């Protein structure tokens, strides 16, 4: 199962999920259109989501599971791959809880301007092209931005700007995989899963000095 919890941030409530001792989800809990991300994880990992704590004491609604909503990014297919097998449930459950705690703590440090780099182990689930885009996103430095055209060129597909943008939308690990650092070629903010206000806040935060 994928253990999940909700975590409040200045940008809104984030839905965190862990599987196999790695973080597989950090997405915007209040955006219904993001349900396709949850569905992709369930199908790619062949598991379902389960809340943590088990008593449901965390506020808000969790993942809705598989729905009939079509995947807008074309990754809703049996060829979706993942860097994980089926871990032992007991040991994995403890590891997943530790990962969720660590992710929440590092997010708090990030929003408090006390952290610039995350070291939580990540698990991505997507097509080879999507995962190549996400890997490239992790190379964009804190405080910097890149364009969709730059990403496409770096991947060797300069005309695949729309495909790169779609892969950004499909990113299940917001902030940890910093798709908010991607802007239009003219510097415009363009879109963002958490909304433009959240993107503006994140980019503004990353231009503040690091507090010790």
Name each model-derived stretch.
Residues 1-158, 209-212:
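Basic nucleic-acid-binding alpha-helical/helix-turn surface characteristic of O6-alkylguanine DNA
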Residues 14, 128, 145, 158, ...:
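Gly/Ser/Thr-rich beta-alpha loop segments that engage phosphate groups in nucleotides
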Residues 118-122, 164, 189-192:
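Short clusters of hydrophobic/aromatic residues that line enzyme substrate/ligand-binding pockets
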Residues 158-161, 202:
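LysM (lysin motif) carbohydrate-binding repeats in extracellular/periplasmic proteins that recognize
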Residues 161-171:
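Regulatory, non-catalytic segments
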Residues 174, 185-212:
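…primarily DNA-binding HTH/wHTH and HhH modules…
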Residues 178:
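Short, small/polar-rich loop/turn modules that mediate ligand/substrate recognition or access, typified
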Residues 181-183:
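Short, basic, alpha-helical segments at the C-terminal edge of helix-turn-helix-like DNA-binding modules
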């Amino acid at each position: 199962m994928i253990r999940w919890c909700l975590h409040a941030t200045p940008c809104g409530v984030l839905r965190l999920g862990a599987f196999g001792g790695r973080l597989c989800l950090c997405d915007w809990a209040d955006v219904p259109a993001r349900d396709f991300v949850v569905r992709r994880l369930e199908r790619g990992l062949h598991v379902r989501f389960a809340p943590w704590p088990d008593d449901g004491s965390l506020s808000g609604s969790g993942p809705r599971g598989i729905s009939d909503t079509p995947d807008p990014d074309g990754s809703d297919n049996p060829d979706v791959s993942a860097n994980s097998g089926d871990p032992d449930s007991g040991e994995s459950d403890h590891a997943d809880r530790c990962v969720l705690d660590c992710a929440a703590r590092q997010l708090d440090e990030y929003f408090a301007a006390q952290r610039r780099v995350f070291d939580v182990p990540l698990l991505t689930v997507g097509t080879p092209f999507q995962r190549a885009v996400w890997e490239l996103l992790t190379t964009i430095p804190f405080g910097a931005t890149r364009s969709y055209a730059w990403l496409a060129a770096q991947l060797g597909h300069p005309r695949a700007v729309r495909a790169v943008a779609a892969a950004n939308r499909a990113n299940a690990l917001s902030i940890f995989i910093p798709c908010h650092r991607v802007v239009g070629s003219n510097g415009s903010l363009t879109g963002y899963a958490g909304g433009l206000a959240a993107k503006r806040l994140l980019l503004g935060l990353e231009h503040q000095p690091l507090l010790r």
